[in-house]
């Protein structure tokens, strides 16, 4: 069975969970505590960042690499177009979402979290 090591609130882990759901693949999650839990995953995989997918003896890290792996093990529905032009367009949008958009969301999220924590003091 597929095993997704994740931090639930990570947008990259959410991206993988959405791909797994779209493919209707069975999997189990292993919640990793930021910082402390990452030591354990680093010792197992050599990777510091999440998500990490275990597919039997195969270890895949990075949300985009995991999705490419899922495309190989479950063909339908396709998450990445077959045509070169369309696949490149998807990759450009994905790279933008993973970098520029994710950083912006993180800034807003942290600002809102700070406001909430100040309200409860």
Regions found by a protein language model. Name each.
Residues 1-119:
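GST-like domain detector, emphasizing the conserved glutathione-binding G-site
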């Amino acid at each position: 069975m597929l095993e997704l090591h994740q931090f639930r609130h990570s947008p990259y882990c959410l991206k993988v969970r959405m791909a797994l759901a779209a493919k209707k693949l069975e999997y189990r999650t292993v919640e990793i505590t930021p910082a402390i839990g990452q030591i354990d995953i680093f010792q197992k995989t050599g990777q510091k960042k999440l998500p990490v997918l275990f597919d039997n003896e195969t270890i895949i890290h990075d949300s985009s690499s995991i999705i490419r792996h899922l495309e190989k093990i479950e063909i339908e529905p396709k998450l990445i177009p077959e045509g070169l032009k369309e696949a490149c367009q998807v990759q450009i949008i994905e790279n933008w979402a993973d970098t520029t958009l994710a950083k912006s969301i993180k800034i807003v999220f942290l600002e809102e979290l700070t406001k909430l924590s100040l309200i409860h003091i």
